[in-house]
Amino acid sequence: NIEIFQKIKKKIFPFYKNKDLKFVFKKLQEDSSNQSIPAKFVGGCVRKYLSNEDIDDIDIATSLTTDKIKEKIKEKKFKVIESGIKHGTVTLVKNKLKLELTTLRRDIKTDGRHAEIEFTDNWLEDSKRRDLTINAIYLDINGKIYDYHDGARDLKTNVVKFIGDPNTRIQEDYLRIIRFLRFAIQYDS
């Protein structure tokens, strides 16, 4: 869609001028085939971008493991915070830039708050474990949107809904009901 691409180019590409962010994407892309894009923006930064809101946090989903991420970015002297290493999450900090990178994963078992996970390289599988359609929209470094659950449409029409069965989503993590209510109020759904 040309209109969406023009919006992305206008709003996000100036954001890509950050040399450290470009470095991270370049390093994560190394050794991958042209068919495979190993890192994409996801969650709040994509949702806020599509809603023309200020982006205050940057989440990146990746098919790479945390060890591989740390190895690839070591030359740039990021502060690496192992914020959720057992769940595949590292936070990279440099100057005012803070990036949270999480390995693609799927839930194996949940207890209402914490999940036992398994890493995957499947973007659709990763998207299915997210809470809301508007938080499961991916955006690659080239501005292409990957939207497996019609989250962009829901965002445009101010619809806040769970991915799949709401009861299942809430049983997996009880905090999701609070997030749902927060977004329903925010987007006046």
What do these predicted ranges mean?
Residues 1-189:
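Catalytic cores of the polymerase beta-like nucleotidyltransferase superfamily
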